[in-house]
Amino acid sequence: MKKLALIVIFLFGSLISFAQDGPLPTRSVFAELGGSGLAYSFNYDFRFDKTRMDSWGMRVGAGGYKIGGDSFFSLPVLVNKLYGKDERFFELGLGMTFFGVDNETYSYCQSFDSNGNCIGPLVTEKSDVNFILPVDGSPNLMGTMNIGYRKIPVDGGFTWRVNLTPIFNNNGFWPLFAGIGFGYAF
């Protein structure tokens, strides 16, 4: 009985060590809603040390949209550190998001006669540039932090993340911004 138990333990241990001999999934591509890309972004994340998952890394992404006369573009760049083992990691990161906003210009009349014709001055305005915090024009930079959880399979494959993403700029600090992402680790 002891021999059988030792053989099973030896074979099982060999399979486990064999499964971990392959390359670690130190790179991933993912889509994120909210987070450092502000509205949404598509990202590439990699570890500087290809032999360890719980190490320093970097993330670069891009996102944007155009709806009517409004458009938005973002380019998040962050340095991050993963803490954990196996598939579960706590993430801390810090970076900047370059973004540009083009808001629609609109005009309106301040005074009308009894027939509904404009008799006052025609006012033309462009809506303010804001994304949660006021910003001083566009293009601009927004500082971002990343505090979150990542699940990365040891053999690669489907990965997901959820994070709290405080944002800041010269006009303030907003601690309650968040993001959720899904992607593929390889």
Over which residues does each language-model region extend?
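Generic cytosolic/nucleocytoplasmic N-terminal low-complexity/intrinsically disordered segments
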Residues: 1-2, 31, 162
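Bacterial Sec-dependent N-terminal signal peptides
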Residues: 1-23, 182, 186
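Residue-level marker of intrinsically disordered, low-complexity segments enriched
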Residues: 5-7, 14, 28, 117, ...
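A general structural-boundary detector
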Residues: 6, 18, 30-31, 134, ...
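A broad, structure-centric signal for solvent-exposed, well-ordered loop/edge residues
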Residues: 7-8, 38-40, 51, 86, ...
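A generic alpha-helix preference that emphasizes hydrophobic side chains
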Residues: 14-16, 41, 144, 179
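Short glycine/proline- and aromatic-enriched beta-strand/turn motifs that initiate or cap beta-hairpins
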Residues: 20-74
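Outer-membrane beta-barrel transmembrane domain signature
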Residues: 53-55, 64-186
